[in-house]
Amino acid sequence: MARRNYKVLYVSGEVSPFVRVSSLADFMASFPQALEEEGFEARIMMPKYGIINDRKFRLHDVLRLSDIEVPLKEKTEMLHVKVTALPSSKIQTYFLYNEKHFKRSGLFSDLQLGGDHKGSAEKLIFFSVGVMETLVRLGWQPDIIHCNDWHAGLVPLLARTRYAKHDFFKKVKIVQSVHNVYRQGVFQPKMFQKHLDPEVFDGLEREGDDINLLATGIKYADLVTTTSPSYAKQIASDPESSFGMDKALKACKDRFHGILNGMDTRQWNPSSDKLIKKRYSAAQPELKLEDKKVLLEEVGLPFSEETPVVGVITTFDDVQGMGLLKESLSKLLELDLQLIVSGSGNKEFEQELRDLVEEHPEKLAVNTDFTDAFYHQMIAGLDMLIMPSRIESCGMKQMFAMNYGTVPIAYAGGGIVETIEEVSGDKGTGFVFTDYTAEALTAKLGEALSMFDDKERWAELMREGMERDFSWSASAEQYAELYREILG
């Protein structure tokens, strides 16, 4: 008997290339495609933020998905849906839109992130109920709804309360993925109480007096996953690493799995990448030099073949390594290198970096306008990539880097140890430091700089990383097996 093609809806607050803030967007750009290759039919739903360019991404209206009613506790609002295909695939991606909630807005924010908590709570509730109502109008009945991070944490609760008896959702299974345990979707309860019926509101998980959406998603999911086996063990056992989520994860230990992230080797392939200046491969890594020139020109730094270009791509907050970067900068700028820092977040730190650029105009550059094209060119043009995160769930930047012959230097947390092989003798793909200090980072970078001077050995190191298999193949098989398990 032929195996049935199950249907999976992926719900996410970000999907590359439409909008990108974290590695979740990269996951969403590639993982659904990998599961389609395992025999599942995938579709995606996300908010239509005002910052998304309709023309650039060829979004179009769907007549039968206009004027969808979204019933909230005290009122009904209207939802409109636009659609396009995920690039390089046929996967339908639905963008849920309401002028009041999304016309001028950026991404969701919560108490941890600052910003408009009230507005974010309202639009998140609207989006979550909208997902359920859009599915009914669409008539596409998923076997699984796969929710990603806290942005989608309300959907599992809705499926198990308000929509539990709806014929359309009676048999649906829920997966909740934890990509970033630090971001948990913490809100004051006022707006949730205002817009949600009591049976839904009473089911929300609490953190003190506040609502915790990630914990809510975890509680009501049939399957909970995260981005690597090491990270799963770490956050299920260590309150500090999990930011208090360890209790929720221990409570679901029999349905909690860590599966290593993969990457889209079609979108991220230096031999065919249309977003970089010069394409190259493991057979001709020296061609990468042209991308280094272009990158330096783009950020306004002078080019020297002998000077290594080191980069940092991160969010400017303490978990993603802002503190370590601050402590290390003066030491890094004393070394024989050029440094490019790309990221956004803490405005004070951004200004500190710009002040340092004034002092070191030929050694330091800062980029806060992070486009998809710049991301690819930076990964291609760097010699080394520093990953300063204290807790790295798995991340994909190190995989992208190695695939492009850019050598990673990272702290040994989470999935890093499963993706970077520490350089030892003539083996290895990168450099890993085990003490989370500026001294340890600088020392490990020093090792990398010494090896960079040995051109033959450095070329071998580049090739070693470029020849590793970081595709989704093995991990997609594991996910497919778990999907089929919960479906019975």
From Swiss-Prot:
ADP-alpha-D-glucose binds at residue 20. It is an enzyme of class 2 (transferase). It catalyses: [(1->4)-alpha-D-glucosyl](n) + ADP-alpha-D-glucose = [(1->4)-alpha-D-glucosyl](n+1) + ADP + H(+). Pathway: Glycan biosynthesis; glycogen biosynthesis. The keyword Glycosyltransferase applies. Signal peptide: none annotated. GO terms for molecular function: alpha-1,4-glucan glucosyltransferase (ADP-glucose donor) activity; alpha-1,4-glucan glucosyltransferase (UDP-glucose donor) activity. CDD domains: GT5_Glycogen_synthase_DULL1-like. Pfam families: Glyco_transf_5 (PF08323), Glycos_transf_1 (PF00534). GO terms for biological process: glycogen biosynthetic process. Keywords: Glycogen biosynthesis, Glycosyltransferase, Transferase. The keyword Glycosyltransferase applies. Its EC number is 2.4.1.21. Disulfide bonds: none annotated. Gene3D superfamilies: Glycogen Phosphorylase B. Synthesizes alpha-1,4-glucan chains using ADP-glucose. Belongs to the glycosyltransferase 1 family. Bacterial/plant glycogen synthase subfamily. NCBIfam families: glgA, PRK14098.1. This is Glycogen synthase. It comes from Chlorobaculum parvum (strain DSM 263 / NCIMB 8327). The gene is glgA.
